UniProtKB/Swiss-Prot annotation:
It comes from the Eukaryota. It comes from Schizosaccharomyces pombe (strain 972 / ATCC 24843) (Fission yeast). Residues 1-58 are annotated as: Disordered. It is found in: Nucleus. Its main location: nucleus. The gene is iec5. Keywords: Chromatin regulator, DNA damage, DNA repair, Nucleus, Transcription, Transcription regulation. Residues 35-58 have a biased composition (Polar residues). Component of the INO80 chromatin remodeling complex. Component of the INO80 complex which remodels chromatin by shifting nucleosomes and is involved in DNA repair. GO terms for biological process: DNA repair; DNA replication-dependent chromatin assembly; transcription initiation-coupled chromatin remodeling. One of its GO terms (cellular component) is nucleus. This is INO80 complex subunit 5.
Length: 144
């Protein structure tokens, strides 16, 4: 369907000619295989899913899925990346530990402040009572 062109008119294409960004083939998570699959494999697995498996095969599939997951976890534990992340985490903890300790200490310091409502005697009263005790004991020192 070619557009009719009048004199001095530009013919614009029906669709933009700008180069389109090619989207990558997305991977979809497939619950049945417990893995990531391409769209073609996904449509195949959906077609296979239309036929219902027997109950005992479901249990076998669950067991297989579980063992596959455990194997992957073991792989991850052994992998270098896991250990690198673990070391980074420990280093971060060591680096920030002083701040955590300081906050704990500061909190305790703030709690130690004398509360005049809760206590009948404060630092000044303690000092004066100590001086009174000294004076009292001096009487006996003189007597001896």
């Amino acid at each position: 369907m070619a557009a009719q062109k009048k004199q001095g008119e530009r013919v614009l294409p029906a669709r933009s000619t700008r180069k389109r960004r090619q989207l990558p083939d997305m991977l979809y998570y497939d619950e049945r295989t417990d893995s990531y699959v391409t769209p073609q494999e996904r449509s195949l697995s959906e077609a296979n899913a239309q036929t219902r498996p027997a109950p005992n095969t479901i249990n076998q599939a669950v067991d297989a899925k579980q063992s596959a997951r455990e194997a992957r976890v073991q792989e991850l534990m052994k992998s270098k990346l896991y250990h690198l992340r673990k070391q980074q985490k420990q280093a971060r903890h060591k680096r920030d530990q002083w701040a955590i300790d300081y906050l704990e200490w500061k909190k305790n310091e703030d709690e130690d402040v004398w509360n005049s409502d809760a206590e009948a005697t404060g630092p000044a009263e303690h000092t004066s009572s100590f001086l009174d005790a000294l004076r009292f004991s001096q009487q006996f020192m003189k007597a001896e």
